[in-house]
């Protein structure tokens, strides 16, 4: 029989350093028991922040699921910066290489909604962009792909416009011939009368 869930909470602690406190008090979990279990499970992860989902059941037992460190943490670590840019559009806070991007994407893959490394790289690259971190080699590829997409759209629009003009030209030619025929017939009628 499945246990009745009382509460589900998502929190984040430093690996191996969770302590009883206000963030856990609101969850309703046995704090010493949870912190011991969490710290034992994350001790080997250094000082990285570890997101955790805690499910507390009505009988006061609990389960928890650990996630990978946030992509922003890994990006800051790779770029050797303390924080991202306050204005990512105008200020570059740092850079990472394409290899570092791939490593972070592969690390984050279990927590992302994709199984494809390239899609994961795009997700992590988006996070890096929001932080003002440039990905050497990737941003150039992304710009080239975007330019190709825009060029294809422009070519498609030009082709559609050309076809539209051609069909309009044919309609005009066809209608002009009819108008002339009508005019000739009407003039012949007027002359007969």
Swiss-Prot record:
GO-annotated molecular function: large ribosomal subunit rRNA binding; structural constituent of ribosome
Keyword Kinase in record: no
GO cellular component: cytosolic large ribosomal subunit
Keyword field contains NADP: no
Pfam families per UniProt: Ribosomal_L11, Ribosomal_L11_N
Keywords: Methylation, Ribonucleoprotein, Ribosomal protein, RNA-binding, rRNA-binding
InterPro entries linked to this entry: Ribosomal_uL11, Ribosomal_uL11_bac-typ, Ribosomal_uL11_C, Ribosomal_uL11_C_sf, Ribosomal_uL11_N, Ribosomal_uL11_N_sf
Processing after translation: One or more lysine residues are methylated.
SUPFAM superfamilies, alphabetized: Ribosomal L11/L12e N-terminal domain, Ribosomal protein L11, C-terminal domain
Entry superkingdom: Bacteria
GO process terms (BP): translation
Sequence similarity: Belongs to the universal ribosomal protein uL11 family.
Role, per record: Forms part of the ribosomal stalk which helps the ribosome interact with GTP-bound translation factors.
PANTHER family: 60S RIBOSOMAL PROTEIN L12, LARGE RIBOSOMAL SUBUNIT PROTEIN UL11M
Subunit-level organization: Part of the ribosomal stalk of the 50S ribosomal subunit. Interacts with L10 and the large rRNA to form the base of the stalk. L10 forms an elongated spine to which L12 dimers bind in a sequential fashion forming a multimeric L10(L12)X complex.
Protein name stated in the entry: Large ribosomal subunit protein uL11
Species this chain originates from: Mycoplasmopsis synoviae (strain 53) (Mycoplasma synoviae)
Upper taxonomic lineage: Bacteria, Bacillati, Mycoplasmatota, Mycoplasmoidales, Metamycoplasmataceae
Gene it is expressed from: rplK
